[in-house]
Amino acid sequence: APFQSGIIQENEIKSAGSQSELAIAVAGTGNEKILYGLTLGIPFVNYKRTSTFTEADASTALNNFNYAAIEEYLETSGSGVNLKLGIIYRPAPQWRIGFSFHSPTFLKLTDKYSATVTTDTENYKGLLTQSSKEFTNGDLAQYSYLHFTPSRMLASISYVLREIEDVTKQKGFLTGDVEFVNYRASSFKVDPASSDQTETKAYYSKLNDVIDEIYRPAVNVRLGGELKFTTIMTRLGMAYLGNPYQNSNGEKGSRLQLTGGLGYRNQGYFIDLAYVHTTGKDIHSPYRLSQQPFPSAQISQRGARVVLTLGVKF
């Protein structure tokens, strides 16, 4: 029977994860005005996501459909490598002008996935449930692939308060930088160890075409300052992260970040603790249709994270 009262759609998503990086850096100076550095980064990724999408009959009438739901579980883990190159020029003792290039990050990722579909068709078939694990001997389906993130180019300028040779007696600095990221350069490729090379290559070719259509280059702007009290530092900063989407379907990806932190420097050892508060707006679409409109939820983002950095200079 046709639905007279419509369908109620609901999408519940729970996600958690982390991204850490082991950095191996070297730095040097050509003269008193030029400094340079090279960093080898080894990132580690861990992510878990559970999504439940439900469509339910808005009425209580018996029409051979009560609800249908699909619950998906995704676990992603992996590691990779990247390079960062930077140079700082000092036109005057108090000023610093910097340029840096961050290479694409090469990641080898592994997805573990399962899906469970539940339907209640009332008098027709009643309540039925089927899981993808029934086809994988009760295990999560597993698949590995390669992912390349876009490169980044940065330009920065800073002013040092009370510039003297003894850095422990400097009072702080003000800084700003501009970053360019071409998100369209993000791409996925087949893991060379994959057994279904031809079919998978065709899928990733289409996926990369979609990335090229949806994303665009973006500019990120950051401003900040630091005050030094011998070995203790206090910091404040803000960042505006530009929208990476072409807005073909109303996507909004810009974000504003406000940061406060403390730092400790003594005899080559350093500890940095920062709090980052993020706000932004976006949309979420549980599914997309190519030939007709599809539903989207408006999202107001409010997030916070704490970043701890430990290091030693030698």
Locate the predicted segments by residue.
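Outer-membrane beta-barrel porins/channels
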Residues: 1-314
